[in-house]
A protein has these predicted regions:
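Membrane-interface loop-to-helix entry segments
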Residues: 75-132, 163, 186-194, 319-332, ...
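Transmembrane helix-loop boundary segments of multi-pass membrane transporters
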Residues: 1, 60-75, 94-104, 243-247, ...
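Helix-loop-helix connectors at the membrane interface of multi-pass transporters/channels
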Residues: 27-37, 58-78, 110, 169-179, ...
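TM-loop-TM module centered on a large, flexible mid-protein loop between adjacent transmembrane helices
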Residues: 28, 35, 67, 154, ...
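Helix-loop-helix junctions that connect adjacent transmembrane segments
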Residues: 72-73, 105-242
Length: 432
């Protein structure tokens, strides 16, 4: 369901980004097609989302490095990796692009090998490894262990894993020939989701039962409990734990690197639109908005809270906060696209003139909006139904919602902003 939702969201974003490529992406679209305060709140929410994600990834890096160096304090590793991410982004956009290419290559090769080994095991090709068939899907409470509550609870984490797909829209403002390249990138999203997410999860479900004692350890710092590691070890790869640890580290650096790029560009665009202090609009000779980069790096330093509260606790806080912010951003994409298409047609626009058209409109954005709402509001409803209300749990899960509403409504009240009517929308592709 999350994969299908993300696919519809990316086709929605692709339609707008190919027609109107801007660095502000869906935040600019929110201002143009919904209401100025809505775009303002989306922009700050998205900057905060990725800035916090950087901190979350740096905490994850601490957990990964503890596998090799358990005696070294985690904050040292966070400082080192924060410096690496900063260095890759401060040079130029090319530095970000080159590093992401190699990070992505490592992940792609690993997932392809994982799927290949998994399928070979499923079909009984791997020598000495017995195929469980479909038994793991039929045993006990499988495949829907925990029922609806568990599905909603895990949806936020699944959504966190998909976050970053919307970077296509952010990069559109700096890409060459976006009217041609954005549609190509969007069309590849379906196959990437199918192969790298759905197929990999299918392989894990087929080969590793939910009752596996390794999965119940609940130790985030133990790489041996990773489903990827378990599968490789059972296929006879003795060094699987160390290898997967290195791959996961590269994935963490990739996610943090992307977060640094996205949040910096978002803050820069907010400054250009007058929605953030003007000092964040200044760029270096190589085109890097360094003041925005400095501010983002400062928020990323939240990872150092682990020295006071513990790495696993801080990681959970940051993961919940970032996950909720990501779903708010996706809600903004769905709303903006629905209104863009309506406004575009209301002003006499022709679908044939769009460089890319989202499939199954209006079902796509409406489905994505509805599912986002269910997951966002129902994420931690169990905190309300127990004998005592878990106020700390509620705060950790939902803090992003009141912050978003406060920013939106505060801006709306101060600027006297109003919703944009379909006939008044700026749908000009050249006014970017």
């Amino acid at each position: 369901l999350i994969g299908l939702m993300v696919y519809f969201l990316m086709t929605s974003l692709g339609e707008m980004a190919a027609y109107m490529p801007v660095s502000g992406s869906f935040c600019t679209y929110g201002s143009r097609f919904v209401e100025d305060g809505f775009g303002f709140a989306l922009g700050w929410n998205y900057w905060y989302n990725w800035a916090v994600t950087i901190a979350a990834e740096l905490v994850a890096a601490q957990l990964v490095m503890s596998f090799w160096f358990p005696e070294v304090p985690g904050i040292y590793w966070s400082a080192i990796f924060l410096g690496i991410m900063f260095g890759l982004n401060v040079i130029s956009a090319r530095g970000f692009g080159e590093s992401e290419f190699w990070f992505a290559l490592i992940k792609v090769v690993t997932v392809v090998i994982f799927i290949g080994v998994g399928l070979a095991t499923i079909f009984g090709i791997m020598h000495g490894v017995e195929s469980p068939g479909f038994s793991n899907f039929t045993m006990g409470d499988a495949p829907f262990v925990g029922g609806f509550q568990a599905m909603v609870g895990v949806a936020m984490i699944a959504g966190f894993s998909f976050q970053g797909t919307e970077l296509i829209g952010i990069a559109a403002g700096e890409s060459e020939n976006p009217r041609k390249n954005i549609p190509i990138a969007i069309r590849q999203v379906f196959w990437r989701i199918l192969m790298f997410y759905i197929l990999a999860i299918f392989v894990i479900g087929m080969l590793i039962p939910y009752t596996d004692p390794n999965l119940l350890k609940n130790d985030a710092s133990d790489i041996s409990v990773s489903p990827f590691t378990l599968l490789f070890e059972r296929a006879g790869f003795a060094a699987a734990a160390g290898l997967m640890n290195a791959v996961i580290l590269s994935a963490i650096l990739s996610a943090g690197n992307s977060g640094m790029y996205a949040s910096t560009r978002m803050l820069y665009n907010l400054a250009l639109e007058g929605k953030a202090p003007r000092l964040f609009s200044r760029v270096s000779r190589s085109g890097v908005p360094r003041n925005a980069l400095y501010a983002t790096t400062l928020v990323g330093a939240l990872c150092f809270l682990t020295s006071a509260f513990g790495d696993s606790t801080v990681y959970t806080w940051l993961l919940n906060t970032s996950g909720m912010c990501g779903f708010i951003a996706w809600l903004g994409i769905a709303i903006s696209h629905y209104r863009f298409r309506k406004g575009y047609l209301a002003q006499g626009g022709r679908l044939e003139d769009l460089p890319y058209r989202a499939k199954l409109f209006p079902f796509g954005p409406l489905f994505a909006f509805a599912l986002c709402m269910v997951i966002t509001l129902g994420q931690n409803y169990q905190a309300l139904v127990g004998e005592r209300i878990d106020w700390i749990g509620l705060l950790a899960t939902y803090i992003s919602l009141p912050l978003f509403l406060a920013i939106w409504l505060g801006y709306r009240w101060k600027k006297r902003a109003r919703f944009v009517r379909y006939h008044e929308m700026d749908v000009s592709p050249t006014n970017t």
